[in-house]
Amino acid sequence: MTASITAKTCEAWFLLEAADMRGLPAPYDVSVTDYGPVKLGLRSVDDLLVWAKSLGVDVTERQHGERIHWNTSGVLHDIPVALFVVTNVEQVAS
């Protein structure tokens, strides 16, 4: 049981760190498109929801059509993405 909780905690923190590295607003905002580069194998929104559920983490869709600012090599892109907010990470870590 401890190994499972440890693995979940590591995965949850990886999720947060990856979101932060990509400059997403707030530490818990993620999107399917943002996870392609970190090789989590998420190909769709359903993949994201299944993966988050396996961690015991709640994921809810934000307002459709929200935009994020993506800074790549000093170039700012204002792009629409399907954002999801991840909550209850504390439960995973405990």
Question: Whereabouts are the PLM-identified features?
Answer:
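Structured alpha/beta or helical-core interaction and ligand-binding surfaces enriched in interleaved
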Residues: 1-94
